[in-house]
């Protein structure tokens, strides 16, 4: 008889921080120097799909990411996640004789992103969230997203926030073990579904300084950073939670922009300095300022992670003015599904020229839900447990 292949397929979302995570107090456990808050983006537009499978016939624990195979145990972060999840399954099997004995079987995990990996679009967050969610579901672990977030965090810090939809906080915790450094939902999508998002991709090339290396250089050398984590972020976390709960966009927007600016100031204060923003990024900031000046209030907010791509938040009710303006300066970029009308905003001409030539792709999305379990039809492995390689989307 052919040996059975057990499998489960999930998708997980990208999240974009509005109060930034940057810096570890414990590198091995991925414990952060400060708490952070993010918005989960809709999986209709950006997602990682992962199938986790196990079988007696598999010889090695293997991950295929976008078609490239790697041994799971050769990657320390993947290995830590698998070891913890496997131990939890084996414990369940020891407690309950009726369970299939799958915990000790080798894993085949296949994962695909529908966006460029390592291009500043938080691919590791969605990737590790999907990886941990798929294996936890395969193993039928009776865990809450917060419990699973402790494991996902050890793969990629920001991944713990992709286990929830809506608005999510990664609480830094206090314990040396990291047991209390977990993600919690601040509010579900339903509390504030009107948030819209425009991602302006400035470069799909791999960034110069990786987040992992960059953040530890900042921790080691930036005096501004110490002020940030001790005196600024704790209050901002509380203010941001209140703004989200009260659906107060102006406060949400101001906190988002000032926190992005301070994060990049800390990068600049690192020695030697780290430059994630480029001329295109700075020009996008000008465009957002022009939009808000014309509106007479803050209706759009920019934020940048460890790369030049801009993420712009706005409310559905202001979509027309925001998108008409962005379209006017990026109409040659890929991703626009229709033409937009004229905008009342006068954009600084130098900024408009830089944005026009510097933005290659636009992704329009919105706040979205947490990981989904997908059907067998969407599985990335065939009946024998090998990748289908359906190709990139």
Curated annotation (Swiss-Prot):
Residues given in the record as (R)-5-diphosphomevalonate binding sites: 21-24, 77, 156-161, 212
Enzyme class: lyase
Pathway: Isoprenoid biosynthesis; isopentenyl diphosphate biosynthesis via mevalonate pathway; isopentenyl diphosphate from (R)-mevalonate: step 3/3
InterPro entries reported in the protein's UniProt record: GHMP_kinase_C_sf, Mev_decarb, Mev_diP_decarb, MVD-like_N, Mvd1_C, Ribosomal_Su5_D2-typ_SF, Ribsml_uS5_D2-typ_fold_subgr
Gene Ontology molecular function, alphabetical: ATP binding; diphosphomevalonate decarboxylase activity
Localization, UniProt: Cytoplasm; Nucleus
Signal peptide: none
Cross-referenced SUPFAM superfamilies: GHMP Kinase, C-terminal domain, Ribosomal protein S5 domain 2-like
Catalytic activity as recorded in UniProt: (R)-5-diphosphomevalonate + ATP = isopentenyl diphosphate + ADP + phosphate + CO2
Predominant cellular place of this UniProt entry's protein: cytoplasm
GO terms under biological process: farnesyl diphosphate biosynthetic process, mevalonate pathway; isopentenyl diphosphate biosynthetic process, mevalonate pathway; sterol biosynthetic process
EC id: 4.1.1.33
UniProt KW keywords: ATP-binding, Cytoplasm, Lipid biosynthesis, Lipid metabolism, Lyase, Nucleotide-binding, Nucleus, Steroid biosynthesis, Steroid metabolism, Sterol biosynthesis, Sterol metabolism
Keyword field contains Lipid biosynthesis: yes
Any GO CC annotation of this UniProt entry: cytosol
Family membership noted in the UniProt record: Belongs to the diphosphomevalonate decarboxylase family.
Quaternary state and interactors: Homodimer.
Protein name: Diphosphomevalonate decarboxylase
Phylogenetic placement of the source organism: Eukaryota, Fungi, Dikarya, Ascomycota, Taphrinomycotina
């Amino acid at each position: 008889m052919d040996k059975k292949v057990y499998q489960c397929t999930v998708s997980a979302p990208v999240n974009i921080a509005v109060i930034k995570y940057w810096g570890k107090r414990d590198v091995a456990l991925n414990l952060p120097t400060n708490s952070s808050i993010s918005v989960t983006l809709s999986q209709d537009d950006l997602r990682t799909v992962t199938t986790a499978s196990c079988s007696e016939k598999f010889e090695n624990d293997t991950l295929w990411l976008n078609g490239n195979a790697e041994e799971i145990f050769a990657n320390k972060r993947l290995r830590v996640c698998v070891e913890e999840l496997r131990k939890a399954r084996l414990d369940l099997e020891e407690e309950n004789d009726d369970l299939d004995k799958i915990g000790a079987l080798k894993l085949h995990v296949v994962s695909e992103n529908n966006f460029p990996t390592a291009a500043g679009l938080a691919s590791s967050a969605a990737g590790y969230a999907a990886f941990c969610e798929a294996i936890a579901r395969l193993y039928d672990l009776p865990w809450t997203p917060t419990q699973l977030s402790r494991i996902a965090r050890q793969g990629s810090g920001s991944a713990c926030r992709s286990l929830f939809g809506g608005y999510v906080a990664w609480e830094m915790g206090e314990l040396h073990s990291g047991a209390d450094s977990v993600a919690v939902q601040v509010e579900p999508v339903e509390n504030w579904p009107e948030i819209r998002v425009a991602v302006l991709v400035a470069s799909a090339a791999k960034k110069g300084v990786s987040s992992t290396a960059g953040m530890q250089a900042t921790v080691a050398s930036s005096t501004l950073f110490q002020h940030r984590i001790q005196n600024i972020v704790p209050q901002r976390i509380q203010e941001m939670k209140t703004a989200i709960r009260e659906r107060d966009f102006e406060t949400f927007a101001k906190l988002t922009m000032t926190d992005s600016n301070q994060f990049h100031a800390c990068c600049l204060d690192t020695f030697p300095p780290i430059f994630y923003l480029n001329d295109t990024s700075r020009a996008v900031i000008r465009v957002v300022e022009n939009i808000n000046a014309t509106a007479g209030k803050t209706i759009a907010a920019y934020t940048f992670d460890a790369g030049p791509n801009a993420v712009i938040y706005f409310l559905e009710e202001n979509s027309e003015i925001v998108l008409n303006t962005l379209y006017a300066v990026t109409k040659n970029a890929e991703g626009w599904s229709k033409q937009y009308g004229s905008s009342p905003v006068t954009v600084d001409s130098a900024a408009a020229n830089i944005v026009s030539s510097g933005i290659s792709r636009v992704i329009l999305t919105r706040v979205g839900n947490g990981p989904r379990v997908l059907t067998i039809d969407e599985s990335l492995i065939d009946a024998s447990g090998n990748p289908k390689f359906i190709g990139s989307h």
